[in-house]
């Protein structure tokens, strides 16, 4: 049975989800029946076709009134500001992928359900009272039919959680710190402008900018045993895509670099195939653009201090990798039944 989805919010993640669906050959499994976005239909079509990070879309795109054509597929375009006004029941929507970045509460999810959707998947962490928060490859097997309002966590949570699990299972993590080196985002100005966060008043292209992050909360939502044992900071850097995460953990078992890299490399080919990748090539952030993995471990940067302190560097395309996991989680939710 084909899964009928709607995309609410057609920004960086929403467009990446649609492009990933077509580029990954999953159209036989998932059909996009509608997209809701306040922007103009013309602008939606243009930004789908031409993308500064991911290049020109390989599929033919055209727009006629409030219909978007991708190849021969027709997708209805909506411009509703209120969830309650969305025609999900009329369109037979199975799962709404809410990529707006605005909504994320249980109340928001229930509004989508009241509008006729059978299930909802948020593209960011959401509130703690959702039915489930999923990091695909780590805990998606815990999804149940009754889980109707689900979060796909965040791009950085999806990146670091598999690596934390691997290190903890093998060596026993005592505690850890995480530094996210994140590309610029659309809440930063091109030139200095007002913002409630004074650091984010500054031009995105001119500085490395510390910002608040809830990544430590994201880690403990998936692994509650690490409450009060992980801390995280984040800086934004003047690139438009791809993120690096510096993970440092103290472990109980004495280890060396070769043991760590052997574990991570093996997992990339076996238990986490398609989710985690591993490289020892001398690559830079641009080389991971459009990479569909949640995490790419850079084995050249693995370090051990005193046999118990591990440092690793993990890359991710914070747009494309996450968009692919949205599709994976969508399939997993549908497989549980409606």
UniProtKB/Swiss-Prot annotation:
Substrate binds at residues 154-156, 200, 213-214, 236. InterPro entries: E4P_DH_bac, GlycerAld/Erythrose_P_DH, GlycerAld_3-P_DH_AS, GlycerAld_3-P_DH_cat, GlycerAld_3-P_DH_NAD(P)-bd, NAD(P)-bd_dom_sf. The active site is at residue 155. One of its GO terms (molecular function) is erythrose-4-phosphate dehydrogenase activity. It comes from the Bacteria. CDD domains: GAPDH_C_E4PDH (cd23937), GAPDH_N_E4PDH (cd17892). It is found in: Cytoplasm. Pfam families: Gp_dh_C, Gp_dh_N. Pathway: Cofactor biosynthesis; pyridoxine 5'-phosphate biosynthesis; pyridoxine 5'-phosphate from D-erythrose 4-phosphate: step 1/5. One of its GO terms (biological process) is pyridoxal phosphate biosynthetic process. It catalyses: D-erythrose 4-phosphate + NAD(+) + H2O = 4-phospho-D-erythronate + NADH + 2 H(+). Its main location: cytoplasm. It is an enzyme of class 1 (oxidoreductase). Signal peptide: none annotated. NAD(+) binds at residues 12-13, 318. Its EC number is 1.2.1.72. PANTHER family: GLYCERALDEHYDE-3-PHOSPHATE DEHYDROGENASE 2. Homotetramer. HAMAP family: E4P_dehydrog (MF_01640). Belongs to the glyceraldehyde-3-phosphate dehydrogenase family. Epd subfamily. Catalyzes the NAD-dependent conversion of D-erythrose 4-phosphate to 4-phosphoerythronate. This is D-erythrose-4-phosphate dehydrogenase. It comes from Pectobacterium carotovorum subsp. carotovorum (strain PC1). The lineage of its organism: Bacteria, Pseudomonadati, Pseudomonadota, Gammaproteobacteria, Enterobacterales.
């Amino acid at each position: 049975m084909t899964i009928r989805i709607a995309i609410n919010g057609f920004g960086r993640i929403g467009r990446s989800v649609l492009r990933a669906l077509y580029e990954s050959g999953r159209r036989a499994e998932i059909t996009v029946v509608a997209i809701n976005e306040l922007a103009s239909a013309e602008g939606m079509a243009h930004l789908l076709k031409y993308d500064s990070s991911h290049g020109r879309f390989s599929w033919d795109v055209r727009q006629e009134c409030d219909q978007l054509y991708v190849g021969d597929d027709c997708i209805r375009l909506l411009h509703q500001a209120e969830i309650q006004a969305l025609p999900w029941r009329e369109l037979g929507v199975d799962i709404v992928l809410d990529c707006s970045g605005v909504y994320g509460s249980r109340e928001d999810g229930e509004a989508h359900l009241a509008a006729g959707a059978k299930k909802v998947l948020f593209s960011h962490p959401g509130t703690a009272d959702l039915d489930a928060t999923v990091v695909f490859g780590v805990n998606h097997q815990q999804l149940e039919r009754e889980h109707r309002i689900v979060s796909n966590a965040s791009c950085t949570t999806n990146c670091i959680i598999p690596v934390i699990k691997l290190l903890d299972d093998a060596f026993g993590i005592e505690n850890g710190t995480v530094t996210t080196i994140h590309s610029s985002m659309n809440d930063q100005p091109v030139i200095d402008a007002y913002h409630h966060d004074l650091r984010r008043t500054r031009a995105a292209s001119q500085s490395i900018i510390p910002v608040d992050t809830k990544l430590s909360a994201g880690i403990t939502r998936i692994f509650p045993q690490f409450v009060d044992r992980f801390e995280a900071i984040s800086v934004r850097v003047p690139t438009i895509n791809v993120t690096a995460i510096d993970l440092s953990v103290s472990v109980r078992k004495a280890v060396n670099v070769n043991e760590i890299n052997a574990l991570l490399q093996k997992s990339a080919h076996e238990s986490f195939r398609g989710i985690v990748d591993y490289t020892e090539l001398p690559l830079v952030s641009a080389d991971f653009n459009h990479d569909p993995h949640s995490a790419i471990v850079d084995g050249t940067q693995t370090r051990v201090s005193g046999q118990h302190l591990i440092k690793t560097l993990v890359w991710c395309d914070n747009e494309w990798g996450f968009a692919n996991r949205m599709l994976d989680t969508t399939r997993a939710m549908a497989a549980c039944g409606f």
